[in-house]
């Protein structure tokens, strides 16, 4: 990340900020990525708002995730991401009736096909048990919800290279130790892996 001059036009400025934010996330420096986003007085770029929300989801900052969710869902109503996050927030806030209504409307959308989301939401609302074998390729929101719902992730789950996912997985108690260690191994290039947490995870793994 250089000290290059910020581009003059608003669009170029937003593009420049996105490059810096994405680079910080790639390096695992989520605190500085979040600080950079927080410096923006009025965020009118949906991609930056999604990054901000994903960082807060990864760090379990649910109060911040839910803070402006109704505003974002209204403003960017074509993107189902905001509607799913809002349903999650409604459940966290004990607004089950609102969540069920929003979920019914979401299911009617032709381009909605997130079966994992539906399974995990049902588990959150009705405490249904889920066969972890059916949960694959989870996005960040769905993975966060498995933690809240205490759904165990299978040991054979295949990790991707997303820094936000990796640094979240190694801290998740519902993920097998072996998989958490794998996430740490994949995250070694990241800047902010706490040594104490890493040692605790490695020490809790029984070598057979």
Residue locations for each model-derived region?
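Post-signal-peptide, soluble extracytosolic/periplasmic N-terminal scaffold domains
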Residues: 1-24
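Solenoid-like repeat scaffolds
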Residues: 2-9, 35-44, 69-78, 104-112, ...
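TPR repeat positional signature
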Residues: 17-20, 49-53, 83
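Residue-level signature for tetratricopeptide repeat
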Residues: 23, 51-56, 89-90
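Structural motif corresponding to the intra-repeat A-B loop/turn of tetratricopeptide repeats
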Residues: 27, 59-60, 93
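Solenoid-repeat scaffolds in large eukaryotic assemblies
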Residues: 30-33, 64-66, 96-102
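TPR/TPR-like (Sel1-like) alpha-helical repeat modules
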Residues: 74-76, 88-114, 122-149
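Long, internal scaffold/assembly segments composed of regular secondary structure
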Residues: 118-208
């Amino acid at each position: 990340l250089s000290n290059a001059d910020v581009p003059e036009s608003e669009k170029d400025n937003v593009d420049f900020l996105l490059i810096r934010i994405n680079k910080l996330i790639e390096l695992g420096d989520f605190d500085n990525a979040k600080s950079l986003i927080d410096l923006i007085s009025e965020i009118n770029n949906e991609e930056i708002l999604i990054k901000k929300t994903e960082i807060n989801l990864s760090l379990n900052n649910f109060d911040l995730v839910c803070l402006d969710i109704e505003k974002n869902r209204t403003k960017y109503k074509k993107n189902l991401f905001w509607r799913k996050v809002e349903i999650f927030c409604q459940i966290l806030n004990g607004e089950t009736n609102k969540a069920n209504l929003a979920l019914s409307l979401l299911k009617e959308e032709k381009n909605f096909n997130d079966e994992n989301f539906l399974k995990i939401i049902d588990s959150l609302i009705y405490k249904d048990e889920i066969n972890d074998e059916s949960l694959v390729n989870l996005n960040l929101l769905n993975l966060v919800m498995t933690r809240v719902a205490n759904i165990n992730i299978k040991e054979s789950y295949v990790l991707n290279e997303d820094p936000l996912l990796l640094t979240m997985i190694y801290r998740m108690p519902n993920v097998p130790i072996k998989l958490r260690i794998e996430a740490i191994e994949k995250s070694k290039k990241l800047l902010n892996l706490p040594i104490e947490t890493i040692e605790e995870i490695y020490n809790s793994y029984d070598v057979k």
